[in-house]
Amino acid sequence: MKKNQIDIVTMGCSKNLVDSELIMKQFEENGFHCTHDSKRPQGEIAVINTCGFIEAAKEESINTILEFINRKKNGQLNKLYVMGCLSQRYKDELEAELPEVDKFYGKFNYKQLLTDLGKADVPACNGVRHLTTPRHYAYVKIAEGCDRHCAYCAIPLITGRHHSRPVEEVLDEVRGLVAQGVKEFQIIEQELTYYGVDLDGKHHITELISRMADIEGVEWIRLHYAYPNQFPLDLLDVIAEKPNVCKYLDIAFQHISNHMLDRMRRHVSKQETLDLIAEIRRRVPGIHLRTTLLVGFPGETDEDFEELKEFVTNARFERMGAFSYSEEEGTYSAIHYKDDVPEDVKQARLDELMAIQQGISEELEAEKVGKTFKVIIDRKEGEYYVGRTEFCSPEVDPEVLVSSSEKSLRIGKFYDVCITDSDEFDLFGEVVK
């Protein structure tokens, strides 16, 4: 057990990761040494940043807490603290069930932890944080919360209403990250296209991204978690015209059947969805779309699912994730709908949908063979350098494996790479001499 060492464990999404990075920086400015997601935690203090989005995430968070409780019982840990979405939503229940945890913090009061550790004079962060990602890319969280209230989603119950950071504050953070050597920026929030509306009633995402793209040193900007309803079409012009805004958009459609979209409270129709996809592809040729779909929602019929399969087949998304519905207490669907799709049917539909997408993804990736792309190198792994094109977000998308026998490549540097082969998961390439 190492004195003055704090082991941080982050569960869930990249938005949680940003919170962990912020508090790690504050810990370090107050004399602590921090590790993140260490396979061999040795600190005298542990902080677990939990996820409470869906049942599987809750279970993973609880199991992690229990692991550290055992370490504490075995004398391998002095203090255990829990923060994040799970403790934001279930603080009272967790305190009653897990008294071994020294204190639970919510999603927004975690900075109180420093005061509780005797560090009352907490320096202001101003977006400066301890990056846990490779030093050439970072996540930038531009807002918290969500005003949409989709029927299945617990996020508004956890994080509250949409709250945008001011434009200048975000831009200052990006400038600071550029000064640290960051080249690539993953722009994240729960509903990116709503950014700024809570500030003055106007969409400001286009202004933000346009101004961000003009900052010297910003090589790539990638946009995550857009919403199809009231999508600001002028954002597409920025994606098309700014060379450092990646031709990539993460936009969750969830379903295509009008019956399902209505029950999900998505406030968008099938035709509006199809029209938006066509407009995106028209305005930004070559754009890669990542989407998320939900199967097994209450009331989903065989006909609804057939529509969804047809949608995936015709839309030919470059990237797609899909999930089966799980009831989340307090949500509209949990209160008003019966979870009436059997679990085996949910799983069968999920498997069938992913099989369709797998074939599409393999075809689209194979079309890249023989073409040259700008690739950033993330790491060396065995006999390959592993990198990504502008069409690939870290952690979730295919990677480019470049043979290390060619020459020594530098992590965080861009190279022109000719794609020589593809498989189910990745691309293979050679640096253009």
Label the predicted regions.
Residues 170, 187, 223, 251, ...:
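Conserved, mostly hydrophobic/aromatic
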Residues 78-84, 89, 94, 179-305, ...:
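Conserved SAM/AdoMet-binding glycine-rich loop
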Residues 247-248, 261-262, 285-288, 303-305, ...:
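Extended hydrophobic-aromatic, low-complexity segments
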